[in-house]
Amino acid sequence: MSAKSKGNPSSSSAAEGPPAASKTKVKEQIKIIVEDLELVLGDLKDVAKELKEVVDQIDTLTSDLQLEDEMTDSSKTDTLNSSSSGTTASSIEKIKEQANAPLIKPPAHPSAILTVLRKPNPPPPPPRLTPVRCEEPQRVVPTANPVKTNGTLLRNGGLAGRPNKIPNGDICCIPNSNLDKAPLQSLMHRPEKDRSPQAGPRERVRFNEKVQYHGYCPDCESRYNIKNREVHLHSEPVHPPGKIPHQGPLLHPPPHLPNFPLENGGLGISHSNSFPPPTPATVPPPAAPKPQKTILRKSTTTTV
């Protein structure tokens, strides 16, 4: 370009045209940019107007909350003075904070309701003292008034003095002659010895279906059917020492059985030395020969 301009002076005038054209193009582009900026400013003004409308709607909605006058005035001045997007955003945040602040403060009416609800509530100590007073007589009653029995107490509360039903349904028959002279014992010794024997050698106790023991008394001489199973009969008479055996079969006391509980909490027969046995004078002599005692056991033995 420089070589051509030096050789031909006419070409230099032609070369000065392109810079002038470029300047005009730049000016046109600047005008276009300014117009675009004006459009953007117009859009921003529209957005500001919309934000003001939103703020007015918020004020109308929050007017029912009875806001303080100072806070409402400050919010209005902030919204009117905001002219740019940054100021409008800050004013919106302030309005949100001011709208949330009065909600945290409790109004006057709910506080009055709370005070009314607190007054009728009774103090906690009185209801705690009432059960303690009720428990004291319950602890004193069993120790102060011991119940006298004949030494044969069942765990379910029944007495063996009169015909009583054992929990499994059988009836325990004991003659009344042995009850008057039997040793008396109170309930206070029961916790020490949980196993209480039954007085009287003649009694009938029926256990669960696996093991059955039948002792016959003078009033009950019937026999039970053991559901067609094998039965072992023990019919050997036992004579106490120092007595002459009678011609007819004599009664013998039931064998010593271990103490074991029934299914529903009762106690089995136990002839231990924990309770003194009744005196021999209290037992009336048999008037007539009676059938010999038999012990019926099933072939299937169980450990309790």
Swiss-Prot record:
Keyword Coiled coil in record: yes
Biased composition (Low complexity): 1-22, 77-91
Cross-referenced InterPro entries: Largen/INSYN1 (IPR027997)
Bias type Pro residues, positions: 120-129, 275-289
Keyword Coiled coil listed: yes
Gene Ontology process terms (BP): positive regulation of cell size; positive regulation of translation
Coiled-coil parts of chain: 33-70
Keywords: Coiled coil
Region (Disordered): 1-27, 66-109, 114-133, 236-304
Extra information: Overexpression causes embryonic lethality. Conditional overexpression leads to increased cell size.
Function recorded in the entry: Regulator of cell size that promotes cell size increase independently of mTOR and Hippo signaling pathways. Acts by stimulating the translation of specific mRNAs, including those encoding proteins affecting mitochondrial functions. Increases mitochondrial mass and respiration.
Protein name as annotated: Protein Largen
Organism for this UniProt entry: Mus musculus
Organism lineage string: Eukaryota, Metazoa, Chordata, Craniata, Vertebrata
Designated gene of the protein: Prr16
